[in-house]
């Protein structure tokens, strides 16, 4: 059974990273993915939107897919996933192929087998946790 990293491991990770690709980032203010990405920007993270339907979100160029984002936006530290659970296995396979260093599956995005596969491939993996809430709980 997949287990998330410990709280200290997640906190150390969030202190270390700088660039977050948000897969499934909505251009619509008020949507959870938009709110989380906006709040992560306030913490100083660079957001790389991945949404084929929007040219720009939150002042950043949006990319149609993860591969083009990784090639065009420069190094990405983590992929924050706002997609339905049935898409996670495919996302993890792509993350492994692209050598993504970390995958963070937001609240409600649960696929234990895919999360374990990512971890087994050496990818720092968090499942069913909100990156923003975890970062906010750390304080300044």
Where are the predicted features?
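Rossmann-fold NAD(P)-binding glycine/threonine-rich loop
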Residues: 107-135
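Short internal beta-strands
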Residues: 48-51, 103-107
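A short helix->loop->beta-strand "cap" motif at the edges of active sites that frequently abuts
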Residues: 43-45, 98-103, 121-123
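Glycine-rich, highly charged phosphate/nucleotide-binding loops
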Residues: 1-6, 57-89
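Rossmann-fold NAD(P) dinucleotide-binding segment
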Residues: 87-104
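NAD(P)-binding Rossmann-fold cofactor-contacting core
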Residues: 23-31, 38-58
């Amino acid at each position: 059974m997949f287990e998330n990293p410990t709280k200290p491991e997640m906190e150390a990770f969030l202190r270390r990273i700088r660039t977050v690709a948000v897969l499934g980032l909505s251009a619509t203010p008020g949507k959870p993915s938009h709110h989380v990405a906006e709040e992560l920007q306030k913490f100083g993270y660079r957001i790389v939107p991945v949404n084929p339907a929007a040219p720009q979100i939150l002042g950043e160029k949006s990319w149609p897919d993860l591969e083009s984002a990784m090639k065009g936006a420069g190094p990405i530290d983590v992929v924050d996933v706002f997609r339905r659970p049935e898409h996670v296995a495919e996302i993890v396979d792509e993350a492994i192929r692209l050598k993504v260093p970390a995958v963070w599956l937001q609240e409600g995005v649960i696929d234990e087998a895919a999360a374990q596969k990512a971890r087994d491939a050496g990818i720092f993996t968090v499942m069913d946790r909100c990156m923003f809430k975890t970062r906010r709980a750390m304080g300044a």
